[in-house]
Protein backbone atom coordinates (compact mmCIF):
# COMPACT_ATOMS: atom_id res chain seq x y z
CA UNK A 1 0.00 0.00 0.00
CA UNK A 2 1.46 3.34 -1.03
CA UNK A 3 1.35 6.06 1.56
CA UNK A 4 1.95 9.73 0.90
CA UNK A 5 4.88 11.59 2.41
CA UNK A 6 4.28 13.69 5.49
CA UNK A 7 6.63 16.64 5.88
CA UNK A 8 6.54 17.64 9.51
CA UNK A 9 8.21 20.87 10.64
CA UNK A 10 11.14 19.20 12.42
CA UNK A 11 14.75 18.27 11.54
CA UNK A 12 16.84 15.20 12.41
CA UNK A 13 20.56 14.79 12.90
CA UNK A 14 20.66 11.02 12.99
CA UNK A 15 21.31 8.94 9.89
CA UNK A 16 20.14 5.46 8.97
CA UNK A 17 19.54 3.23 5.94
CA UNK A 18 16.76 4.17 3.60
CA UNK A 19 13.37 2.49 3.47
CA UNK A 20 10.10 3.56 1.88
CA UNK A 21 6.81 5.30 2.19
CA UNK A 22 6.09 8.21 4.62
CA UNK A 23 9.19 10.36 5.29
CA UNK A 24 8.93 12.84 8.16
CA UNK A 25 11.76 15.05 9.42
CA UNK A 26 11.96 15.12 13.21
CA UNK A 27 14.11 17.04 15.65
CA UNK A 28 14.37 14.61 18.53
CA UNK A 29 15.37 11.00 19.13
CA UNK A 30 12.48 8.60 18.71
CA UNK A 31 13.71 6.01 21.22
CA UNK A 32 10.77 6.81 23.51
CA UNK A 33 8.19 7.37 20.78
CA UNK A 34 5.09 5.17 21.26
CA UNK A 35 5.57 3.04 18.11
CA UNK A 36 7.55 -0.11 17.52
CA UNK A 37 11.10 0.17 16.14
CA UNK A 38 10.08 -2.00 13.19
CA UNK A 39 7.69 0.73 12.11
CA UNK A 40 10.44 3.23 11.31
CA UNK A 41 14.07 3.60 10.25
CA UNK A 42 16.45 6.44 9.27
CA UNK A 43 17.76 7.23 5.81
CA UNK A 44 21.35 8.29 5.09
CA UNK A 45 20.16 11.84 4.57
CA UNK A 46 18.93 11.94 8.15
CA UNK A 47 15.22 11.60 7.37
CA UNK A 48 12.97 9.38 9.45
CA UNK A 49 11.21 6.78 7.27
CA UNK A 50 7.94 5.25 8.46
CA UNK A 51 7.62 1.70 7.19
CA UNK A 52 4.33 0.28 5.96
CA UNK A 53 2.90 -0.72 9.30
CA UNK A 54 -0.69 -0.04 8.29
CA UNK A 55 -2.58 3.09 7.40
CA UNK A 56 -3.32 3.96 11.02
CA UNK A 57 0.24 5.14 11.70
CA UNK A 58 0.37 7.48 8.70
CA UNK A 59 -3.14 8.69 9.41
CA UNK A 60 -2.04 9.69 12.87
CA UNK A 61 0.94 11.63 11.52
CA UNK A 62 -1.16 13.22 8.81
CA UNK A 63 -3.62 14.20 11.49
CA UNK A 64 -0.83 15.80 13.47
CA UNK A 65 0.14 17.78 10.39
CA UNK A 66 -3.44 18.94 9.94
CA UNK A 67 -3.55 20.01 13.58
CA UNK A 68 -0.32 21.99 13.21
CA UNK A 69 -1.57 23.69 10.04
CA UNK A 70 -4.80 24.55 11.79
CA UNK A 71 -2.89 25.97 14.75
CA UNK A 72 -0.71 28.04 12.42
CA UNK A 73 -3.80 29.34 10.66
CA UNK A 74 -5.35 30.15 14.05
CA UNK A 75 -2.21 32.07 15.00
CA UNK A 76 -1.94 33.99 11.74
CA UNK A 77 -5.65 34.67 11.43
CA UNK A 78 -5.49 37.42 14.02
CA UNK A 79 -3.22 39.39 11.71
CA UNK A 80 -5.33 38.91 8.60
CA UNK A 81 -7.92 41.50 7.74
CA UNK A 82 -11.54 40.31 7.44
CA UNK A 83 -10.72 36.60 7.75
CA UNK A 84 -12.00 34.22 10.45
CA UNK A 85 -9.33 33.38 12.98
CA UNK A 86 -9.90 29.64 13.26
CA UNK A 87 -10.56 28.81 9.64
CA UNK A 88 -8.19 26.56 7.70
CA UNK A 89 -8.69 27.78 4.15
CA UNK A 90 -9.29 25.54 1.18
CA UNK A 91 -6.25 27.07 -0.49
CA UNK A 92 -4.05 25.95 2.39
CA UNK A 93 -5.43 22.43 2.23
CA UNK A 94 -4.77 21.97 -1.44
CA UNK A 95 -1.38 23.61 -1.23
CA UNK A 96 0.05 21.62 1.65
CA UNK A 97 -1.90 18.34 1.81
CA UNK A 98 -1.59 15.20 -0.27
CA UNK A 99 -4.53 13.06 -1.41
CA UNK A 100 -4.42 10.82 1.68
CA UNK A 101 -4.20 13.85 3.94
CA UNK A 102 -7.15 15.48 2.23
CA UNK A 103 -9.09 12.26 2.74
CA UNK A 104 -8.30 12.34 6.41
CA UNK A 105 -9.34 15.99 6.53
CA UNK A 106 -12.73 15.09 5.02
CA UNK A 107 -13.29 12.50 7.77
CA UNK A 108 -12.42 14.92 10.56
CA UNK A 109 -13.81 18.15 9.12
CA UNK A 110 -16.71 18.34 11.56
CA UNK A 111 -14.50 17.78 14.59
CA UNK A 112 -13.27 20.93 16.30
CA UNK A 113 -9.92 19.93 17.76
CA UNK A 114 -9.06 21.78 20.95
CA UNK A 115 -5.61 23.46 21.00
CA UNK A 116 -4.53 21.35 23.95
CA UNK A 117 -5.63 18.06 22.38
CA UNK A 118 -2.98 15.81 20.82
CA UNK A 119 -4.05 14.44 17.45
CA UNK A 120 -2.15 11.21 18.21
CA UNK A 121 -4.99 10.32 20.51
CA UNK A 122 -3.90 11.45 23.98
CA UNK A 123 -3.18 14.71 25.71
CA UNK A 124 0.50 15.56 25.56
CA UNK A 125 0.42 16.12 29.31
CA UNK A 126 -1.65 13.00 30.11
CA UNK A 127 -0.12 11.31 33.13
CA UNK A 128 2.52 13.97 33.67
CA UNK A 129 2.23 16.82 36.14
CA UNK A 130 5.18 18.85 34.82
CA UNK A 131 6.49 19.45 31.33
CA UNK A 132 9.87 18.24 32.55
CA UNK A 133 8.32 14.83 33.30
CA UNK A 134 7.27 14.32 29.68
CA UNK A 135 9.12 11.78 27.53
CA UNK A 136 11.67 13.51 25.27
CA UNK A 137 9.56 13.32 22.12
CA UNK A 138 6.32 14.40 23.80
CA UNK A 139 8.16 17.26 25.52
CA UNK A 140 9.65 18.29 22.16
CA UNK A 141 6.23 18.22 20.51
CA UNK A 142 4.75 20.19 23.41
CA UNK A 143 7.46 22.86 23.09
CA UNK A 144 7.12 23.05 19.30
CA UNK A 145 3.34 23.33 19.40
CA UNK A 146 3.58 25.92 22.16
CA UNK A 147 5.80 27.95 19.83
CA UNK A 148 3.15 27.65 17.12
CA UNK A 149 0.55 29.14 19.45
CA UNK A 150 2.82 31.91 20.76
CA UNK A 151 2.30 35.32 19.15
CA UNK A 152 4.97 37.94 18.72
CA UNK A 153 4.63 40.83 21.14
CA UNK A 154 4.09 44.38 19.89
CA UNK A 155 5.36 47.68 21.27
CA UNK A 156 4.12 51.01 19.89
CA UNK A 157 5.89 54.26 20.76
CA UNK A 158 4.31 57.65 20.03
CA UNK A 159 7.06 60.27 19.91
CA UNK A 160 5.51 63.66 20.64
CA UNK A 161 2.90 62.05 22.88
CA UNK A 162 1.68 65.27 24.49
CA UNK A 163 0.98 67.03 21.19
CA UNK A 164 -2.47 67.74 19.81
CA UNK A 165 -2.24 65.09 17.07
CA UNK A 166 -1.26 62.35 19.51
CA UNK A 167 -3.92 63.26 22.06
CA UNK A 168 -6.72 63.88 19.58
CA UNK A 169 -6.10 61.22 16.94
CA UNK A 170 -3.32 58.69 17.55
CA UNK A 171 -4.17 57.43 21.04
CA UNK A 172 -7.95 57.26 20.31
CA UNK A 173 -7.17 55.27 17.15
CA UNK A 174 -4.95 52.88 19.11
CA UNK A 175 -7.69 52.38 21.69
CA UNK A 176 -10.27 51.65 18.97
CA UNK A 177 -7.94 49.01 17.53
CA UNK A 178 -7.38 47.57 21.00
CA UNK A 179 -11.13 47.40 21.67
CA UNK A 180 -11.74 45.64 18.34
CA UNK A 181 -9.04 43.03 18.99
CA UNK A 182 -6.61 44.24 16.33
CA UNK A 183 -3.94 44.81 18.98
CA UNK A 184 -2.69 41.93 21.14
CA UNK A 185 -3.91 41.94 24.74
CA UNK A 186 -0.33 42.34 25.98
CA UNK A 187 0.51 45.26 23.66
CA UNK A 188 2.72 47.92 25.23
CA UNK A 189 2.15 51.56 24.22
CA UNK A 190 4.74 54.18 25.08
CA UNK A 191 4.41 57.93 25.04
CA UNK A 192 7.65 59.85 24.50
CA UNK A 193 8.08 63.61 24.88
CA UNK A 194 10.32 66.25 26.43
CA UNK A 195 7.98 66.94 29.34
CA UNK A 196 8.73 65.61 32.81
CA UNK A 197 5.74 63.30 33.33
CA UNK A 198 4.96 59.93 34.90
CA UNK A 199 3.04 56.93 33.60
CA UNK A 200 -0.01 58.11 35.53
CA UNK A 201 0.26 61.60 34.05
CA UNK A 202 0.21 60.17 30.54
CA UNK A 203 -2.73 57.93 31.38
CA UNK A 204 -4.68 60.92 32.66
CA UNK A 205 -3.96 62.83 29.44
CA UNK A 206 -5.06 59.87 27.33
CA UNK A 207 -8.20 59.19 29.40
CA UNK A 208 -9.59 62.63 28.60
CA UNK A 209 -9.61 61.85 24.86
CA UNK A 210 -10.81 58.23 24.74
CA UNK A 211 -14.35 57.40 23.67
CA UNK A 212 -16.08 54.25 22.50
CA UNK A 213 -17.81 54.18 19.14
CA UNK A 214 -21.54 53.56 18.98
CA UNK A 215 -20.91 49.90 18.11
CA UNK A 216 -18.19 49.61 20.80
CA UNK A 217 -20.20 50.11 23.99
CA UNK A 218 -19.96 46.66 25.58
CA UNK A 219 -17.54 46.74 28.53
CA UNK A 220 -16.25 50.10 27.32
CA UNK A 221 -15.00 51.19 30.74
CA UNK A 222 -13.19 47.93 31.35
CA UNK A 223 -11.48 48.12 27.97
CA UNK A 224 -10.40 51.69 28.65
CA UNK A 225 -8.87 50.68 31.98
CA UNK A 226 -7.07 47.74 30.39
CA UNK A 227 -5.77 49.92 27.57
CA UNK A 228 -4.48 52.61 29.92
CA UNK A 229 -2.74 50.00 32.06
CA UNK A 230 -0.70 49.09 28.97
CA UNK A 231 0.55 52.67 28.43
CA UNK A 232 3.87 53.96 29.76
CA UNK A 233 5.75 57.24 29.63
CA UNK A 234 9.38 57.94 28.72
CA UNK A 235 10.97 61.37 29.13
CA UNK A 236 13.23 62.01 26.15
CA UNK A 237 14.08 64.89 23.82
CA UNK A 238 13.99 64.68 20.05
CA UNK A 239 17.70 63.82 19.78
CA UNK A 240 18.10 62.46 23.31
CA UNK A 241 19.98 59.18 22.95
CA UNK A 242 19.63 58.48 26.67
CA UNK A 243 15.87 58.82 26.41
CA UNK A 244 15.67 56.44 23.43
CA UNK A 245 17.98 54.00 25.21
CA UNK A 246 15.65 54.06 28.23
CA UNK A 247 12.72 53.46 25.89
CA UNK A 248 14.49 50.48 24.29
CA UNK A 249 15.41 49.05 27.70
CA UNK A 250 11.85 49.30 28.96
CA UNK A 251 10.59 47.66 25.79
CA UNK A 252 13.01 44.77 26.34
CA UNK A 253 11.73 44.29 29.89
CA UNK A 254 8.17 43.92 28.61
CA UNK A 255 9.06 41.84 25.55
CA UNK A 256 11.16 39.26 27.38
CA UNK A 257 12.92 36.73 25.18
CA UNK A 258 10.11 36.20 22.66
CA UNK A 259 9.93 37.61 19.15
CA UNK A 260 9.02 41.27 19.43
CA UNK A 261 7.92 43.88 16.89
CA UNK A 262 8.07 47.65 17.28
CA UNK A 263 6.28 50.64 15.72
CA UNK A 264 7.44 54.23 16.21
CA UNK A 265 4.94 56.98 15.33
CA UNK A 266 6.91 60.21 14.79
CA UNK A 267 4.39 62.93 15.66
CA UNK A 268 7.03 65.65 15.73
CA UNK A 269 7.73 68.94 13.88
CA UNK A 270 9.41 68.61 10.49
CA UNK A 271 12.61 70.23 11.73
CA UNK A 272 12.98 67.52 14.40
CA UNK A 273 12.06 64.57 12.21
CA UNK A 274 15.55 63.55 11.07
CA UNK A 275 17.03 63.73 14.58
CA UNK A 276 14.25 61.60 16.03
CA UNK A 277 14.40 59.01 13.26
CA UNK A 278 18.18 58.67 13.42
CA UNK A 279 18.14 58.35 17.21
CA UNK A 280 15.56 55.58 16.98
CA UNK A 281 17.50 53.88 14.21
CA UNK A 282 20.67 53.83 16.30
CA UNK A 283 19.21 52.97 19.70
CA UNK A 284 15.74 51.44 19.63
CA UNK A 285 15.20 49.06 16.71
CA UNK A 286 13.81 45.62 17.56
CA UNK A 287 16.57 43.02 18.05
CA UNK A 288 14.11 40.19 17.23
CA UNK A 289 11.24 40.99 14.89
CA UNK A 290 10.45 43.94 12.63
CA UNK A 291 10.67 47.69 13.23
CA UNK A 292 8.43 50.20 11.41
CA UNK A 293 8.35 53.99 11.64
CA UNK A 294 5.42 56.25 10.74
CA UNK A 295 6.32 59.67 9.32
CA UNK A 296 3.75 62.48 9.11
CA UNK A 297 3.35 64.74 6.07
CA UNK A 298 4.49 67.08 4.59
CA UNK A 299 7.49 65.16 3.32
CA UNK A 300 9.86 68.07 2.87
CA UNK A 301 9.45 71.67 1.79
CA UNK A 302 10.70 71.20 -1.79
CA UNK A 303 12.53 68.67 -3.94
CA UNK A 304 15.89 69.30 -2.29
CA UNK A 305 14.72 69.09 1.32
CA UNK A 306 12.61 66.04 0.51
CA UNK A 307 15.63 64.32 -1.03
CA UNK A 308 17.70 65.05 2.07
CA UNK A 309 14.92 63.72 4.32
CA UNK A 310 14.66 60.52 2.30
CA UNK A 311 18.43 60.09 2.29
CA UNK A 312 18.57 60.47 6.08
CA UNK A 313 15.74 58.00 6.66
CA UNK A 314 17.23 55.41 4.32
CA UNK A 315 20.59 55.68 6.10
CA UNK A 316 18.96 54.14 9.20
CA UNK A 317 15.99 52.17 7.85
CA UNK A 318 15.05 50.13 4.81
CA UNK A 319 12.32 51.46 2.53
CA UNK A 320 9.94 48.71 3.66
CA UNK A 321 10.24 49.97 7.26
CA UNK A 322 9.12 53.54 6.44
CA UNK A 323 5.41 54.40 6.36
CA UNK A 324 4.76 57.98 5.17
CA UNK A 325 1.27 58.70 6.43
CA UNK A 326 -1.35 61.11 5.13
CA UNK A 327 -4.52 60.68 7.17
CA UNK A 328 -6.69 61.78 4.25
CA UNK A 329 -5.61 58.64 2.37
CA UNK A 330 -7.19 56.55 5.12
CA UNK A 331 -10.69 57.62 4.12
CA UNK A 332 -13.03 54.90 2.91
CA UNK A 333 -13.45 56.81 -0.36
CA UNK A 334 -9.78 56.27 -1.26
CA UNK A 335 -9.92 52.53 -0.55
CA UNK A 336 -13.07 52.36 -2.65
CA UNK A 337 -11.38 53.71 -5.78
CA UNK A 338 -9.65 50.46 -6.69
CA UNK A 339 -12.64 48.38 -5.57
CA UNK A 340 -15.03 50.23 -7.88
CA UNK A 341 -12.63 50.15 -10.80
CA UNK A 342 -11.38 46.59 -10.69
CA UNK A 343 -14.36 44.66 -9.29
CA UNK A 344 -17.14 46.14 -11.46
CA UNK A 345 -17.31 45.36 -15.16
CA UNK A 346 -19.62 48.33 -15.67
CA UNK A 347 -16.76 50.78 -14.92
CA UNK A 348 -13.37 49.38 -15.90
CA UNK A 349 -14.03 49.03 -19.69
CA UNK A 350 -15.13 52.70 -19.73
CA UNK A 351 -12.19 53.96 -17.65
CA UNK A 352 -10.25 55.70 -20.42
CA UNK A 353 -10.10 58.70 -22.73
CA UNK A 354 -12.67 57.22 -25.12
CA UNK A 355 -15.52 57.47 -22.63
CA UNK A 356 -14.39 59.84 -19.87
CA UNK A 357 -14.53 63.57 -20.59
CA UNK A 358 -12.91 64.88 -17.40
CA UNK A 359 -12.24 64.06 -13.75
CA UNK A 360 -12.58 66.56 -10.91
CA UNK A 361 -11.15 66.16 -7.40
CA UNK A 362 -12.73 68.55 -4.89
CA UNK A 363 -11.84 69.24 -1.26
CA UNK A 364 -13.85 72.15 0.09
CA UNK A 365 -13.70 73.15 3.76
CA UNK A 366 -16.16 75.62 5.26
CA UNK A 367 -14.03 76.21 8.37
CA UNK A 368 -11.21 78.72 8.87
CA UNK A 369 -7.68 77.90 7.86
CA UNK A 370 -5.78 75.51 10.10
CA UNK A 371 -2.38 76.27 11.59
CA UNK A 372 -0.66 73.90 9.15
CA UNK A 373 -1.19 76.33 6.27
CA UNK A 374 0.09 79.21 8.38
CA UNK A 375 3.58 77.81 8.93
CA UNK A 376 4.92 78.49 5.45
CA UNK A 377 4.00 75.13 3.87
CA UNK A 378 0.72 76.24 2.34
CA UNK A 379 -2.04 74.21 0.81
CA UNK A 380 -0.01 72.97 -2.18
CA UNK A 381 2.75 71.38 -0.12
CA UNK A 382 0.42 70.08 2.56
CA UNK A 383 -2.53 68.68 0.59
CA UNK A 384 -1.86 68.71 -3.16
CA UNK A 385 1.56 67.02 -2.91
CA UNK A 386 0.31 63.96 -1.07
CA UNK A 387 -3.45 63.54 -0.95
CA UNK A 388 -4.48 65.04 -4.30
CA UNK A 389 -1.72 63.47 -6.39
CA UNK A 390 -2.15 60.11 -4.66
CA UNK A 391 -5.88 60.23 -5.39
CA UNK A 392 -5.21 60.97 -9.06
CA UNK A 393 -2.65 58.15 -9.19
CA UNK A 394 -5.18 55.64 -7.83
CA UNK A 395 -7.85 56.90 -10.24
CA UNK A 396 -5.61 56.75 -13.29
CA UNK A 397 -3.26 53.81 -12.70
CA UNK A 398 -3.24 50.64 -14.79
CA UNK A 399 -4.52 47.44 -13.14
CA UNK A 400 -1.76 46.13 -10.85
CA UNK A 401 -0.66 42.51 -11.16
CA UNK A 402 -1.94 41.92 -7.60
CA UNK A 403 -3.25 43.81 -4.58
CA UNK A 404 0.16 43.63 -2.94
CA UNK A 405 1.24 47.06 -1.75
CA UNK A 406 4.39 47.13 -3.87
CA UNK A 407 2.49 46.20 -7.03
CA UNK A 408 0.00 49.02 -6.44
CA UNK A 409 2.77 51.52 -5.68
CA UNK A 410 4.59 50.48 -8.86
CA UNK A 411 1.54 51.50 -10.89
CA UNK A 412 0.98 54.73 -8.96
CA UNK A 413 4.50 55.99 -9.56
CA UNK A 414 4.08 55.37 -13.32
CA UNK A 415 1.11 57.74 -13.32
CA UNK A 416 2.97 60.41 -11.36
CA UNK A 417 5.90 60.25 -13.77
CA UNK A 418 3.49 60.60 -16.71
CA UNK A 419 1.86 63.83 -15.51
CA UNK A 420 2.68 66.67 -17.87
CA UNK A 421 4.63 69.66 -16.61
CA UNK A 422 2.05 72.07 -15.22
CA UNK A 423 1.63 75.40 -16.94
CA UNK A 424 1.74 78.09 -14.19
CA UNK A 425 -1.20 79.75 -15.96
CA UNK A 426 -3.23 76.63 -15.15
CA UNK A 427 -2.78 77.17 -11.41
CA UNK A 428 -5.09 79.53 -9.50
CA UNK A 429 -4.23 80.59 -5.95
CA UNK A 430 -6.65 82.19 -3.52
CA UNK A 431 -6.80 83.46 0.02
CA UNK A 432 -9.86 84.49 2.01
CA UNK A 433 -9.92 88.14 3.00
CA UNK A 434 -8.05 89.51 6.01
CA UNK A 435 -11.18 90.76 7.73
CA UNK A 436 -12.52 87.22 7.71
CA UNK A 437 -9.19 85.87 8.98
CA UNK A 438 -9.11 88.38 11.82
CA UNK A 439 -12.67 87.49 12.76
CA UNK A 440 -11.83 83.80 12.90
CA UNK A 441 -8.59 84.27 14.78
CA UNK A 442 -6.32 82.91 12.05
CA UNK A 443 -3.32 84.92 10.92
CA UNK A 444 -1.60 84.05 7.64
CA UNK A 445 1.43 85.52 6.00
CA UNK A 446 0.88 87.51 2.82
CA UNK A 447 1.34 84.77 0.22
CA UNK A 448 0.33 81.46 1.81
CA UNK A 449 -2.72 80.36 -0.23
CA UNK A 450 -5.83 78.91 1.36
CA UNK A 451 -7.19 77.89 -2.05
CA UNK A 452 -5.66 76.16 -5.06
CA UNK A 453 -7.21 75.15 -8.37
CA UNK A 454 -5.20 73.46 -11.12
CA UNK A 455 -5.53 71.55 -14.39
CA UNK A 456 -3.35 68.48 -14.91
CA UNK A 457 -2.88 66.14 -17.87
CA UNK A 458 -1.48 62.61 -17.98
CA UNK A 459 0.53 61.85 -21.08
CA UNK A 460 -0.16 58.18 -21.67
CA UNK A 461 -2.37 56.13 -23.97
CA UNK A 462 -5.22 55.74 -21.49
CA UNK A 463 -5.63 59.40 -20.50
CA UNK A 464 -4.28 61.47 -23.38
CA UNK A 465 -6.25 64.73 -23.58
CA UNK A 466 -8.41 64.15 -20.48
CA UNK A 467 -8.18 67.06 -18.02
CA UNK A 468 -7.90 66.31 -14.31
CA UNK A 469 -9.24 69.39 -12.52
CA UNK A 470 -8.35 69.96 -8.88
CA UNK A 471 -9.73 72.48 -6.42
CA UNK A 472 -8.82 72.55 -2.76
CA UNK A 473 -9.73 75.32 -0.35
CA UNK A 474 -10.90 76.42 3.06
CA UNK A 475 -13.29 79.13 4.20
CA UNK A 476 -15.68 78.19 1.38
CA UNK A 477 -19.45 78.05 1.17
CA UNK A 478 -19.76 74.31 1.64
CA UNK A 479 -17.87 71.46 3.24
CA UNK A 480 -17.44 68.52 0.91
CA UNK A 481 -14.91 65.95 -0.33
CA UNK A 482 -15.87 64.52 -3.72
CA UNK A 483 -14.57 63.01 -6.94
CA UNK A 484 -16.56 63.65 -10.13
CA UNK A 485 -16.02 61.42 -13.17
CA UNK A 486 -17.91 62.97 -16.08
CA UNK A 487 -18.48 60.82 -19.14
CA UNK A 488 -18.72 62.01 -22.73
CA UNK A 489 -21.93 62.71 -24.61
CA UNK A 490 -23.68 59.80 -26.26
CA UNK A 491 -22.66 59.86 -29.96
CA UNK A 492 -25.62 60.74 -32.17
CA UNK A 493 -27.90 61.09 -29.16
CA UNK A 494 -31.46 60.49 -30.36
CA UNK A 495 -32.89 62.41 -27.40
CA UNK A 496 -30.83 65.55 -27.76
CA UNK A 497 -33.90 67.74 -28.25
CA UNK A 498 -35.66 66.21 -25.26
CA UNK A 499 -32.89 66.93 -22.75
CA UNK A 500 -33.07 70.73 -22.68
CA UNK A 501 -30.90 73.69 -23.54
CA UNK A 502 -27.88 72.64 -21.43
CA UNK A 503 -26.40 69.67 -23.24
CA UNK A 504 -24.29 68.88 -20.15
CA UNK A 505 -27.48 67.71 -18.44
CA UNK A 506 -27.42 64.77 -20.81
CA UNK A 507 -24.04 63.40 -19.74
CA UNK A 508 -23.60 60.57 -17.31
CA UNK A 509 -21.54 61.20 -14.21
CA UNK A 510 -20.10 59.10 -11.40
CA UNK A 511 -19.78 60.96 -8.09
CA UNK A 512 -17.82 59.50 -5.20
CA UNK A 513 -18.59 61.50 -2.08
CA UNK A 514 -16.70 61.15 1.18
CA UNK A 515 -18.18 64.09 3.07
CA UNK A 516 -20.61 65.30 4.31
CA UNK A 517 -22.44 61.97 3.83
CA UNK A 518 -20.45 59.19 2.19
CA UNK A 519 -22.17 58.03 -0.97
CA UNK A 520 -21.73 56.69 -4.49
CA UNK A 521 -23.96 58.50 -7.01
CA UNK A 522 -24.52 57.79 -10.71
CA UNK A 523 -26.27 60.39 -12.84
CA UNK A 524 -28.41 58.89 -15.59
CA UNK A 525 -31.10 60.09 -18.01
CA UNK A 526 -34.63 58.75 -17.64
CA UNK A 527 -38.12 59.42 -19.00
CA UNK A 528 -40.41 61.57 -16.90
CA UNK A 529 -43.68 59.69 -16.19
CA UNK A 530 -46.67 60.86 -18.18
CA UNK A 531 -47.70 61.52 -21.74
CA UNK A 532 -45.16 62.80 -24.19
CA UNK A 533 -41.40 62.26 -24.13
CA UNK A 534 -39.53 64.37 -21.64
CA UNK A 535 -36.15 63.36 -20.19
CA UNK A 536 -34.80 64.12 -16.76
CA UNK A 537 -31.35 63.72 -15.17
CA UNK A 538 -31.65 61.59 -12.03
CA UNK A 539 -29.28 60.05 -9.52
CA UNK A 540 -28.91 56.44 -8.55
CA UNK A 541 -27.46 56.63 -5.07
CA UNK A 542 -25.84 54.40 -2.50
CA UNK A 543 -25.91 56.31 0.77
CA UNK A 544 -23.61 54.52 3.19
CA UNK A 545 -25.37 55.57 6.39
CA UNK A 546 -28.60 54.01 5.09
CA UNK A 547 -27.00 50.89 3.65
CA UNK A 548 -24.53 50.11 6.44
CA UNK A 549 -25.64 50.60 10.03
CA UNK A 550 -22.17 50.94 11.47
CA UNK A 551 -19.82 53.72 12.41
CA UNK A 552 -16.96 54.13 9.94
CA UNK A 553 -13.53 53.81 11.59
CA UNK A 554 -11.41 56.94 11.73
CA UNK A 555 -8.76 57.26 9.02
CA UNK A 556 -5.95 57.07 11.59
CA UNK A 557 -7.40 53.81 12.88
CA UNK A 558 -7.44 52.46 9.34
CA UNK A 559 -3.88 53.48 8.53
CA UNK A 560 -2.31 52.37 11.82
CA UNK A 561 -4.00 49.01 11.33
CA UNK A 562 -2.40 48.81 7.89
CA UNK A 563 1.02 49.53 9.41
CA UNK A 564 0.58 46.71 11.92
CA UNK A 565 -0.58 44.44 9.11
CA UNK A 566 2.33 45.44 6.85
CA UNK A 567 -0.01 46.76 4.12
CA UNK A 568 1.75 49.76 2.56
CA UNK A 569 -0.33 50.53 -0.54
CA UNK A 570 -1.79 53.74 0.96
CA UNK A 571 1.62 55.03 2.03
CA UNK A 572 3.98 56.91 -0.29
CA UNK A 573 7.21 55.25 -1.33
CA UNK A 574 10.30 57.42 -1.73
CA UNK A 575 10.10 57.37 -5.54
CA UNK A 576 6.46 58.51 -5.34
CA UNK A 577 7.46 61.38 -3.07
CA UNK A 578 10.19 62.43 -5.52
CA UNK A 579 7.86 62.16 -8.53
CA UNK A 580 5.24 64.32 -6.80
CA UNK A 581 7.83 67.01 -6.04
CA UNK A 582 8.97 66.94 -9.68
CA UNK A 583 5.40 67.88 -10.64
CA UNK A 584 4.96 70.70 -8.14
CA UNK A 585 8.45 72.17 -7.67
CA UNK A 586 8.47 74.17 -10.96
CA UNK A 587 5.12 75.74 -10.04
CA UNK A 588 6.24 76.56 -6.49
CA UNK A 589 9.48 78.07 -7.81
CA UNK A 590 7.49 80.31 -10.17
CA UNK A 591 5.25 81.42 -7.31
CA UNK A 592 8.24 82.21 -5.10
CA UNK A 593 10.19 83.86 -7.92
CA UNK A 594 7.42 86.23 -8.95
CA UNK A 595 5.90 86.57 -5.47
CA UNK A 596 2.54 85.63 -6.94
CA UNK A 597 -0.22 87.09 -4.79
CA UNK A 598 -3.29 84.90 -4.20
CA UNK A 599 -6.64 86.23 -5.38
CA UNK A 600 -8.74 87.29 -2.40
CA UNK A 601 -12.20 85.84 -1.85
CA UNK A 602 -14.91 86.24 0.75
CA UNK A 603 -14.92 83.86 3.67
CA UNK A 604 -17.91 81.58 3.16
CA UNK A 605 -17.94 82.31 -0.58
CA UNK A 606 -17.26 80.19 -3.65
CA UNK A 607 -13.56 80.93 -4.01
CA UNK A 608 -11.60 82.94 -6.59
CA UNK A 609 -13.44 83.95 -9.75
CA UNK A 610 -10.39 82.93 -11.81
CA UNK A 611 -11.11 79.27 -11.00
CA UNK A 612 -14.33 79.45 -13.04
CA UNK A 613 -12.39 80.75 -16.04
CA UNK A 614 -9.87 77.92 -15.64
CA UNK A 615 -12.68 75.36 -15.84
CA UNK A 616 -14.10 77.06 -18.93
CA UNK A 617 -10.64 77.19 -20.54
CA UNK A 618 -10.41 73.40 -20.39
CA UNK A 619 -14.02 72.83 -21.41
CA UNK A 620 -15.11 71.42 -18.08
CA UNK A 621 -18.53 72.19 -16.54
CA UNK A 622 -18.22 73.47 -12.98
CA UNK A 623 -19.43 70.91 -10.44
CA UNK A 624 -22.23 72.58 -8.50
CA UNK A 625 -21.37 74.05 -5.11
UniProtKB/Swiss-Prot annotation:
UniProt-annotated binding residues for NADP(+) 2: 471, 480, 513, 606
MF-aspect GO terms: glucose-6-phosphate dehydrogenase activity; NADP binding
Transit peptide location: 1-49
InterPro entries named in the record: G6P_DH, G6P_DH_C, G6P_DH_NAD-bd, NAD(P)-bd_dom_sf
Catalytic residue positions: 387
GO biological process, one term: pentose-phosphate shunt
Residues reported in the UniProt entry to bind NADP(+) 1: 160-167, 194, 297
Assembly behavior: Forms homodimer. Interacts with G6PD1.
Other comment: There are 6 glucose-6-phosphate 1-dehydrogenase genes in A.thaliana.
Function statement: Seems to be a catalytically inactive enzyme.
Identification of the protein by name: Inactive glucose-6-phosphate 1-dehydrogenase 4, chloroplastic
Record organism: Arabidopsis thaliana (Mouse-ear cress)
Gene designation: G6PD4
Amino acid sequence: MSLSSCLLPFSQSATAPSSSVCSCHLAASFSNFPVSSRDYSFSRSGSLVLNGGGSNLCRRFCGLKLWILKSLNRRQGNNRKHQPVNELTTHSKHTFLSDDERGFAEETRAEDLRPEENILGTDLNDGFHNVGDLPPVSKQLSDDLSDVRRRASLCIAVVGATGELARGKIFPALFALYYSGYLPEDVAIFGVSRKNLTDEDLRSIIASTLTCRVDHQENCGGKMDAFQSRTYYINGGYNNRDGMSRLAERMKQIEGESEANRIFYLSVPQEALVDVACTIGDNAQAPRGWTRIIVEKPFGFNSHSSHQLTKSLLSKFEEKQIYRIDHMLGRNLIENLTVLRFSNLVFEPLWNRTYIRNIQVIISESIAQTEKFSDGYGIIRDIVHSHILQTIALLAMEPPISLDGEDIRNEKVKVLRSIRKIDPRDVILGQYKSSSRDKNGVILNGVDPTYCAAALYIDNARWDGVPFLVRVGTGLIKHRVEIHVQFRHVPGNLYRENIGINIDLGTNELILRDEPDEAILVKINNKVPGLGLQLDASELNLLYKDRYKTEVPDSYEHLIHDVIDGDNHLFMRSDEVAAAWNILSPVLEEIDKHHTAPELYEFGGRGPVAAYYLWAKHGVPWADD
